[in-house]
Swiss-Prot record:
HAMAP family per record: HisE, HisIE
Catalyzed reactions per annotation: 1-(5-phospho-beta-D-ribosyl)-ATP + H2O = 1-(5-phospho-beta-D-ribosyl)-5'-AMP + diphosphate + H(+); 1-(5-phospho-beta-D-ribosyl)-5'-AMP + H2O = 1-(5-phospho-beta-D-ribosyl)-5-[(5-phospho-beta-D-ribosylamino)methylideneamino]imidazole-4-carboxamide
One biological process term in Gene Ontology: L-histidine biosynthetic process
Entry similarity comment: In the N-terminal section; belongs to the PRA-CH family. In the C-terminal section; belongs to the PRA-PH family.
Keyword set, alphabetical order: Amino-acid biosynthesis, ATP-binding, Cytoplasm, Histidine biosynthesis, Hydrolase, Multifunctional enzyme, Nucleotide-binding
Chain spans, region Phosphoribosyl-ATP pyrophosphohydrolase: 115-203
Keyword Cell wall biogenesis/degradation: no
Organism this protein belongs to: Shigella sonnei (strain Ss046)
Keyword Nucleotide-binding part of the UniProt annotation: yes
Descriptive protein name: Histidine biosynthesis bifunctional protein HisIE
């Protein structure tokens, strides 16, 4: 998040009091939208944790999602090298664009975004009816059963690779990834935590 020194160094005069703000998906890196903030909008964004702009058409502060419920939850805010533009990393609740797409720039989503969306769906399935949802049934069966499924799918993935069956390997790898995500959710872990750990190992 912005430090006090970074906030003091922002060049509001250069931008006539309205600073362009690029909002980027904190997980996938997809550019979600462009908006403008004045100092008050920035203050409210930091205080509320939800992206708030100054609307040039409404001439007032406008929290993204205040009508639709599709909020942008702030993860981090950073200035550019000239202190006249802000980059906001956020996790969106629902589609960002009023047209129903994830980005106001059209279908620019990276394939990794689907994993994030799947992860959110799997988290929601924790409270679903086990009678109507396979995922909910897995959660209800307990950690040992979920772990067993991960092991089974891992073996099947390896076997498909040993016989060079690319079709089956793709299917089994998909099953393995799905069950691994369920296991992570069962343990209150997410894919971002795993990715960060991989990054640390790579350094």
């Amino acid at each position: 998040m912005l430090t006090e020194q970074q906030r003091r160094e922002l060049d509001w005069e250069k931008t006539d009091g309205l600073m362009p703000v690029i909002v980027q998906h904190a997980v996938s890196g997809e550019v979600l939208m462009l908006g403008y903030m004045n100092p008050e909008a920035l203050d409210k964004t930091i205080e509320s944790g939800k992206v708030t702009f100054f609307s040039r058409t409404k001439q007032r502060l406008w929290t993204k999602g205040e009508t639709s419920g599709n909020f942008l939850n702030v993860v981090n805010i950073a200035p550019d090298c000239d202190n006249d533009t802000l980059l906001v990393l956020a996790n969106p609740i629902g589609p960002t664009c009023h047209k129903g797409t994830s980005s106001c720039f059209g279908d620019t989503a990276h394939q990794w975004l689907f994993l994030y969306q799947l992860e959110q769906l799997l988290a929601e399935r924790k409270s679903a009816d086990p009678e109507t949802s396979y995922t909910a049934k897995l959660y209800a069966s307990g950690t040992k059963r979920i772990a067993q499924k991960v092991g089974e799918e891992g073996v099947e993935t390896a076997l498909a690779a040993t016989v060079h069956d690319r079709f089956e390997l793709t299917n089994e790898a998909s099953d393995l990834m799905y069950h691994l995500l369920v296991l992570l959710q069962d343990q209150d872990l997410d894919l971002t935590t795993v990715i960060e750990n991989l990054r640390k190992r790579h350094q």
